[in-house]
A protein has these predicted regions:
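Short glycine/serine/threonine-rich phosphate/pyrophosphate-binding segments
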Residues: 103, 134-140, 162, 206-209, ...
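N-terminal ligand-binding/catalytic initiation module
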Residues: 1-87, 286-296
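Glycine/charged-rich beta-loop-alpha catalytic/anionic-binding loops adjacent to active sites
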Residues: 85-93, 123, 247-250
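Rossmann-like adenosine-cofactor binding region
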Residues: 175-253
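Glycine-rich phosphate/diphosphate-binding loop of Rossmann-like nucleotide-binding domains
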Residues: 113-197
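Conserved active-site and cofactor/substrate-binding residues in soluble primary-metabolism enzymes
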Residues: 37-41, 71-75, 101, 105, ...
Length: 296
């Protein structure tokens, strides 16, 4: 019987040990890592992997795309898909730095908490994303926007990097992300005045909002933080929080471990789908969100 083999590709110097462990624990028989992979090398690598097995066993071959750049990972996934043709099609899965499954989990938990505890839909909700140009922030913003939320990317400095990033996301996905200056306490206070949902997706150990800033967020319903490394990204949001009261205005906190529980099962579940499917799969943040919704 053909073995389930996963070829794991990254533009970085090292493949993530986290993802290797996840793949093997989910049911892959073997993994092979390819590092420092450029976009231009994807086609040859994909076709090298697919031609080594009979059409009957092609689906037992999978490719995972990692890295730390959400848009580059999607470009690599697109290049990989274009390299395939029948009857040698194989399964593809992009999850750079675990960001697609983490973002999917965060939005799924936020959506569920909004509905069950605030009687509020995600669609139409004003959502502010801190750490917006990172991989998790990018994916979270796109998922929320595609679900109909009114999403603002919060810029932490005076450069136009966030504006350019938002323009590229809007172009690619047909959404309408806004950008707001969050470089000063005063500008962050202005952002929080209208936010119903705040997502903290900055680097581990970086606090983006303190309790004083949150105190002025009169419309805030949910504050979600993916940072598990002290200090928390949002002051007052414990890593274990899962719809836990935050402050005195009725807002609820969702912490990194509550999100991480769903993220872990989402990534594992997608790997399992690849090992068990009888047809080739193509997985990114969209399929991750579909699964995360059932797990939240």
């Amino acid at each position: 019987m053909a073995k389930n083999i996963l070829h794991m590709m990254t533009p970085l110097a090292h493949m993530s040990p986290f993802d290797v462990n996840m793949a093997l624990d989910a049911g892959y028989d073997a993994t092979a890592s390819y590092t420092n992979v450029s976009l231009g090398e994807i086609t040859d690598l994909i076709q090298d992997a697919m031609f080594s097995r009979s059409p009957r066993d092609a689906v037992r071959t999978g490719v995972f795309i990692g890295g730390k750049d959400a848009l580059l990972a999607l470009d690599m996934l697109d290049a990989a898909g274009k390299a395939l043709f029948k009857p040698f099609e194989i399964s593809l899965f992009a999850d750079p730095a675990g960001s697609f499954t983490t973002a999917a989990a965060m939005i799924a938990v936020v959506e569920k908490t909004l509905k069950e505890k605030k009687d509020r839909a995600l669609r139409g909700a004003p959502v502010s994303v801190f750490g917006a140009t990172g991989v998790v922030g990018t994916a979270s913003a796109v998922i929320a926007a595609l679900e109909g939320a009114s999403v603002t990317l919060v810029a932490r400095d005076a450069s136009d990097r966030t504006t350019r990033h938002a323009a590229e996301i809007n172009r690619r996905f047909g959404v309408n992300l806004a950008v707001a200056d969050g470089s000063t306490p005063q500008s962050r206070a202005a952002i929080l005045t209208g936010a119903e949902v705040v997502l903290a997706a900055a680097k581990a150990g970086v606090r983006v909002l303190d309790a004083g800033e949150l105190a002025g967020a009169g419309k805030l319903l949910i504050a979600a933080d993916v940072n598990a490394v002290p200090p928390s990204g949002i002051e007052g949001v414990d890593a274990h929080a899962n719809g836990t009261p935050l402050g005195e205005r009725g807002a609820l906190g969702i912490g990194a471990l509550a999100i991480g529980n769903v993220k872990y099962r989402t990534e594992s579940g997608l790997f399992k789908q690849m090992t068990e499917s009888k047809t080739p799969l193509r997985l990114d943040f969209r399929q991750a969100f579909e699964l995360a919704r059932t797990l939240a």
